[in-house]
């Protein structure tokens, strides 16, 4: 029995080795340079397949995404917060150092007598100590109440006298009254203002002369004409106001001419 089992096992091994070799022969074997097939060279296999088997480095072709506005804002906010935190820590350390080297004076405990006069005068310290000793806990610390003034009447609301029918002698005041006929004697200007508004809307480029110019024109036209008889302007009246002055010249046109010196003979000395 043992011999039969050994022969079967050997036969099985030989069969498996044959099958594996046959599979290898049928399959594709990739060497370093060429590709072989059991039947022969396949026409469907690329010649430069070895160049495509290695994955290329795509990092050089990668374009990073641009940061959004929110990401930029958050990054700037983080930087600002970290900077403020560092400044605060530095200020705390600086303040602690200053307070350690220069402690402020205490008016209650006079342990540090040398530093007290640097900050406060002696008179002020004496006043503080006196007020501290004179203070009583039962003393009322509340300030006195201010006297309540009467409510002031607004200037926009006039006060009208009021007389009662039962008691005509009593005098009262109120902020309103009934309108009378005398209130409606003034000229109404609503229609004029409305007409001006409509004119401005229809003609926006229209310019109006200022009020003072129109008033000056009206006043100039309304000036009274004087009835005084005036004499005509003559040469004699002008000579009375501005008398003539003698000046060098010829005939009657000598007035106003600039003086001239005519040289008849001139000798040049060389």
Swiss-Prot record:
Region spans: Disordered: 1-27
Pfam families hit by this protein: TSGA13
Biased composition (Polar residues): 1-20
Protein name: Testis-specific gene 13 protein
